[in-house]
Curated annotation (Swiss-Prot):
The keyword ATP-binding applies. It comes from Borrelia garinii subsp. bavariensis (strain ATCC BAA-2496 / DSM 23469 / PBi) (Borreliella bavariensis). Disulfide bonds: none annotated. This is Spermidine/putrescine import ATP-binding protein PotA. GO terms for cellular component: ATP-binding cassette (ABC) transporter complex.
């Protein structure tokens, strides 16, 4: 991979003596200036991986190369890697300036340089007039910005962010997502971001690493992860999905509920049992007799940007999302284009 700054090779970790691995043979390459997100449910190993990369925890097996140098034995303060924690970890007895400048002062940086660097950092996070504000006077979003500024002022080559927005309300979280992406682009620093929130991952990332039970399931761009999931877990975890049992009849043709649909996926055997993934927003509803399969609407909920409806077809439930309401009890047909159906091997 061109411009690779971090390479993780065959990394494993376990907390107990029974060999139950929290990380199982992790291999990953990360590029310079990349915004990469570790995404997965609680307990999947993403925070453990961040702690190992930051030097706060030692892996049981494997190697970590940072700019081609193995750093497993390197102490955290020597790694040129900084971490922003979920709880901010700010000093409540210090003001904003002193919090941000703490690391620089520990390195005995000249005062004039400290002042200039803190000023630049405050401007970058949109808080130029808050230098001497008490930490306890700040909102949650402002505290998070200060924590990020404190990490960035040290000019790390890699910034680790462990669910930094989880304590914020929805509106503030969405605003901070945009700010983080903007800051990352301006600084040109590689970010590794940890979250269980699929929206955060899809909004900010250049690439997403989907994890579960200590294993990397898929790595790709947000579009690749959403549109081309490789496993049933990924399809179900990223966005809403309809996942059905189907049969790959022949090249570019699948069978579902007795109807043969055209598809775009190749690499399957004739008559192979497969999983079919159909996103709710890709299903078109037509008058009965005008589409592929017929069903009846059994529920409809308004969700702001669209209606989410449940459609029963041959005793299977389909989730459908549309800006147009189809009333409960109405009989309709579905229509699917070839690119609306994603075919996956059975696990």
């Amino acid at each position: 991979m061109d411009n690779c700054i971090l390479e993780i090779r065959n990394l494993s970790h376990y907390y107990d003596n029974n060999g139950n691995k929290t990380l199982d043979n992790i291999n990953l390459k990360i590029k310079k200036n990349e915004f990469i997100t570790l995404l997965g449910p609680s307990g999947c190993g993403k925070t453990t991986l961040i702690k190992i990369l930051g030097g706060f925890l030692s892996q049981k097996n494997g190697e970590i190369y940072f700019f081609s140098k193995e750093i497993s034995k390197t102490s955290p303060n020597k790694r040129e890697i900084n971490t922003v924690f979920q709880n901010y970890a700010l000093f409540p007895h210090m003001n904003v300036f002193d919090n941000i400048s703490f690391g620089l002062r520990m390195k005995k940086t000249p005062k004039d340089i400290i002042k200039e660097k803190v000023k630049t950092s405050l401007s970058l996070i949109g808080m130029p007039k808050y230098a001497y504000r008490n930490i306890n006077e700040l909102s949650g979003g402002q505290k998070q910005r200060v924590a990020i500024a404190r990490a960035m002022v040290m000019e790390p080559k890699l910034l680790l962010l462990d669910e930094p927005l989880s304590a914020l309300d929805l509106k503030m979280r969405q605003e901070m997502q945009k700010e983080l992406k903007k800051i990352q682009r301006q600084l040109g620093i590689t970010f590794i971001y940890v979250t269980h929130d699929q929206e955060e991952a899809l909004t900010m990332s250049d690439r997403i690493v989907v994890m579960n039970e200590g294993i990397i399931l898929q790595v790709g761009t947000p579009e690749e992860i959403y549109n081309e999931p490789k496993t049933k877990f990924v399809a179900d975890f990223i966005g809403e999905s309809n996942i059905f049992d189907g049969t790959y009849k022949k090249e570019l043709v699948v069978s579902l509920l007795g109807y043969e649909f055209e598809c775009l996926d190749k690499g399957f055997e004739a008559e192979e049992a497969v999983d079919l993934v159909i996103r709710p927003e890709d299903i078109k509803l037509l008058p009965k007799g005008k589409g592929h399969l017929s069903g009846i609407i059994t529920s409809a909920i308004f969700q702001g940007v669209h209606y989410e409806m449940t459609l029963e077809i041959q005793k299977t439930n389909w989730i459908v999302q549309s800006t147009r309401l189809t009333k409960v009890g109405e009989e309709v047909d579905i229509f699917l284009e070839p690119d609306d159906i994603h075919v996956m091997h059975k696990e």
